[in-house]
Amino acid sequence: MIKIFFCREQVIDKREMSSALVVRTLPTPLCLNNFEIGVTLGTGSFGRVRIVTHKATGSIWALKMLKKSEVIRLQQVEHMISEKSILSRMDHPFIVRLAGTFQDPKYLYMTLEYVVGGEFFTHLRRAGRFDHPAARFYASQVILVFEYMHASDFIYRDLKPENLLLDKNGYLKITDFGFAKYVVFKTYTLCGKD
């Protein structure tokens, strides 16, 4: 078994997709058996995201499933640990909330807030482009998130339409914090592709 420290026993109960969130600690650690697994919402380099329902509460989540062997092969262990650590510290209405993490012999799991509107990229592709008021509306939300993160010495480093989700009210939620970083001074690390 490949052992990577990746455990947090907390869940956010989000009944009926209301905007009010209640954070509570579960009496036992999370495991895959706690959830009814639904359809795949998306796939990535070393995992996929599926919609799940927490059996005990009926709450709906997005479960990010990361294959350990691929995380290690692609040298992404530090990014995954960093993502978990940073998301667990974030509390902002435009950032996807991390509810809990767990693992089994093959996978790392991140239980995340399910955002019903899907990827911003899909909406942008469908629209072709947004008018100026809509563009300002979305840009202002990204700026507010960056302002919040920078005030806590975190930087995001992976802004793209695929990492923005739309909630049921049309507001953005930023997701995928694998490249985010805690920076007290300057950083000279480049992210992305050539």
Language-model-derived ranges and their functions:
Residues 24-194:
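Eukaryotic serine/threonine protein kinase catalytic domain
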